[in-house]
Amino acid sequence: MEWRDEGALLSVRRHGESSAIIEVFTAAHGRHAGVVRGGASRKIAPILQPGAQLDLTWKARLDEHMGAFTVEPLRSRTALLGDRLGLAGLNAICAMLHVTLPEREPHSTLWQESMVLLDALDRPGWPPAYLRWEMRLLEETGFGLDLTRCAVTGSREDLAFVSPKTGRAVSSGAAGGWADRLFPLPLALLGQGPASAEEVRQGLAITGHFLGRELAPLLNGRPLPEARARLMELLARA
């Protein structure tokens, strides 16, 4: 078995004396793990940094085997090492892809959007794009939010809240006495105008709630990844 693909490195761990096991998110083969022979060597180890864009060739005797990668660097994202917020964003993306995606299942649209987001992390103003990316993650888990109309009245006007149970929008008038039990709906989630820092934080509280709920069987009682919590902490200070 053999294939060639492009992917971003999600994680790396040492394997034996000189090799490494990497996990990558690829364009056509999804989240995939494999051994890199000599991955702990001085020559290859510097290439294997989270977020690095790689040209990958995977080989295995049988498809169900872990197999081995040969890697060639396409793009390094080590510039983010000097940017605390950008690095936190990169780590959150890698961690969320790891816990969200089944192994070896292609998600081509998410892959394209993830690469665009990773490329944006060294420029200011990327947090709203991260919020939109988490919305896409929810869709990939099969639970996209429905913010097009009020769940109670069907109206498209005056949408002000999100139900924490259904993920559907609720208008201000329909919320009534339940308003304090609902999430405020930031305009950023509706794609209306530029997103303020507060709207991004509100939006991520919503996506975090539903991602945590939908991923609960995979997390086995654990919270969402610490890398995401670290990003939320830094955004709260911004």
Curated annotation (Swiss-Prot):
Keyword DNA damage in annotation: yes
Entry GO terms, CC: bacterial nucleoid
SS bonds (residue pairs): none
Domain of life: Bacteria
GO biological process, one term: DNA recombination
Transmembrane segments: none
Keyword Disulfide bond: no
Alphabetical keyword list: DNA damage, DNA recombination, DNA repair
Matching InterPro entries: ARFGAP/RecO, DNA_rep/recomb_RecO_N, NA-bd_OB-fold, RecO, RecO_C
Family the entry assigns: Belongs to the RecO family.
HAMAP family found in the cross-reference section: RecO (MF_00201)
Protein's job: Involved in DNA repair and RecF pathway recombination.
Protein name: DNA repair protein RecO
